[in-house]
Amino acid sequence: MTIFIHGFGSSGQGSKANLLRDYFKSIDRPFIAPSLSYIPKLAITTLEELIESYNKVNLIGSSLGGYYAIYLSEKYNLKSVLINPATNSVQTLKRAISLTGYAPNFYDNSSFEWRESHLEMLKEYNRDRIESNRYLLLLQKGDNVLDYRDAVAKIPNATMVIEDGGTHQFEGIERHFNIIEEFLEVNNN
């Protein structure tokens, strides 16, 4: 089973999730992309329950989903693909606490309350420098939210694809589906 973990303010129905869902369906491999709570502890609990429900699991995490995937990969010894991952979510998402205290939900343009207590929860899931080679990093230097060099420094032994240009959403992710499949060895599960 491959589980896609979406980013902050996104959902399991986002564009990357849908592209990946269609790809995994085309190769007849199990895939889920749950829509997770914005509350970190609830999101992690949901993901832990899913991981513990399946025999063999791989993760694909994007942005905040990459941060969660690092924590879960280290806890459960899983392979993960990280797409422009947030490696220091506490610092990055501190910016999301606006004057109103609300952050946007990109699925339906609603908003949700994002507070300091949520940042405190995120701290529980931080992992320092990762020496494992169980990771594939897909990074675009043009990411306007995160500095790709932070992920390179945090997970120096990862397999890496680093592209010039691009965006935080990672333009052209479908060009890398074969690399993702090969790295996760989904055909051998």
Walk through the language-model features, giving the residues of each.
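Active-site catalytic motif of lipid deacylating hydrolases and related acyltransferases
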Residues: M1-Y54
